């Protein structure tokens, strides 16, 4: 009797440890799943959807102040500039000699009380345009025009040469293109042969399927049922495809539950046998 009690005690501890391991496995998976779900929810709450609030410049800084000369003080001075040495013509010395004899400009301004309207008249020197009085200046002014005409002629010649050089390659490409068409036709012939070859290869497969069709009545033809189920899965019947894995998962869960119940019942029986 003592030996039986000792063995029962040993078995009791073994079953208890085994049950604890199984429970720890299931509890760990459950806890991990719950923890992962809580982390995902917290991440979703901490990262809200960023709206479209862009920092835009609301203040439009515009020049609203219109500074206008509203003063009524007008300048009536008639200061005229005598002929400067740096003239527009080619002979600045002639400008300097002619300028003292005639004044350049004389301005007269009349101002009203409100200074809103002002009229000015100016008399210019008729001899101010030195390019017209100086024949030498005309010759020097015309030289740049001749240079521009020469450059334009050169550019026109270059454009003509470019257009001539661009024309022949297009004609050559057009003349060569008909020769490439027979080569493409020759290349298309082996492609047609390749397309015919798969039909010949598919013929024995059709024969094999016909033979399998005659063998459905035999008893030893169980693997074909699995192939039929696979065909249904490939056809798109999701119900048939999901049936097998769902049954397997349920059976595994049921087996684990049965083992757990058996171990608990065994430990209870041994505990009663030991202490009673």
From Swiss-Prot:
Where is the region 5 X 6 AA tandem repeats of G-G-S-G-S-A? 53-82
Query: Which residues does the annotated region (Disordered) include?
Result: 44-242
Q: Name the UniProt key words of this record, in alphabetical order.
A: Cell membrane, Disulfide bond, Glycoprotein, GPI-anchor, Lipoprotein, Malaria, Membrane, Merozoite, Repeat, Signal
| Stretch forming the signal peptide | 1-20
What is the membrane topology listed in the Swiss-Prot or TrEMBL record?
A: Lipid-anchor; GPI-anchor
Keyword Repeat recorded: yes
Cell location = Cell membrane
Amino acid composition bias (Polar residues), ranges on this chain: 143-169, 176-187, 194-204
Q: Where is this region: Polymorphic region?
A: 44-202
- Please give the residues the UniProt entry marks as glycosylated: 22, 36, 153, 225, 250
Q: What residues show lipidation of type GPI-anchor amidated asparagine?
A: 250
- Comp. bias intervals (Gly residues): 51-90
- Which GO cellular component does the record give, naming just one? plasma membrane
S-S pairs:
233-241
- Bias (Basic and acidic residues) occurs at 229-238
Q: Cite the record's Low complexity compositional bias ranges.
A: 91-127
Which sections of the protein are sequence repeats?
Answer: 53-58, 59-64, 65-70, 71-76, 77-82
Q: Which residues, in ranges, are excised as the propeptide? A: 251-276
Which GO biological-process labels does this protein carry?
Answer: cell adhesion
Its UniProt domain note says: The N-terminal region appears to be involved in lipid binding.
Job description of the protein: May play a role in the merozoite attachment to the erythrocyte.
**Name the UniProt record assigns to this protein:** Merozoite surface protein 2
Give the source species.
Plasmodium falciparum (isolate 7G8)
The gene it comes from is MSP2
């Amino acid at each position: 009797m003592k030996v039986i009690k000792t063995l029962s005690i040993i078995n009791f501890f073994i079953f208890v440890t085994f049950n604890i391991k199984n429970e720890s496995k299931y509890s760990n998976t459950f806890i991990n799943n719950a923890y992962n779900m809580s982390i995902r929810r917290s991440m979703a709450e901490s990262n809200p959807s960023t709206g479209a609030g862009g920092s835009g410049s609301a203040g439009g800084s515009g020049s609203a102040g219109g500074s206008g000369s509203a003063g009524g003080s007008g300048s009536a001075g008639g200061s005229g500039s005598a002929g400067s040495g740096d003239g527009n013509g080619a002979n600045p010395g002639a400008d300097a000699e002619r300028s003292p004899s005639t004044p350049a400009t004389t301005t007269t301004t009349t101002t009203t009380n409100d200074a809103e309207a002002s009229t000015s008249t100016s008399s210019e020197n008729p001899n101010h345009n030195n390019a017209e009085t100086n024949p030498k200046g005309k010759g020097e002014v015309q030289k740049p025009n001749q240079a521009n005409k020469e450059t334009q002629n050169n550019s026109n010649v270059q454009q003509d040469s470019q257009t001539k050089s661009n024309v022949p390659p297009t004609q050559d490409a057009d003349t060569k293109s008909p020769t490439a068409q027979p080569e493409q036709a020759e290349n298309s012939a082996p492609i047609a042969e390749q397309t015919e070859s798969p039909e010949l290869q598919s013929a024995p497969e059709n024969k094999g399927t016909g033979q399998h069709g005659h063998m459905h009545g035999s008893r030893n033809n169980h693997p074909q049922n699995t192939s039929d189920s696979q065909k249904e899965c490939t056809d798109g019947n999701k119900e048939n495809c999901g049936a097998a894995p769902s049954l397997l998962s349920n059976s595994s869960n049921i087996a684990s539950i049965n083992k757990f119940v058996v171990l608990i019942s065994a430990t209870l029986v041994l505990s009663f046998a030991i202490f009673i």
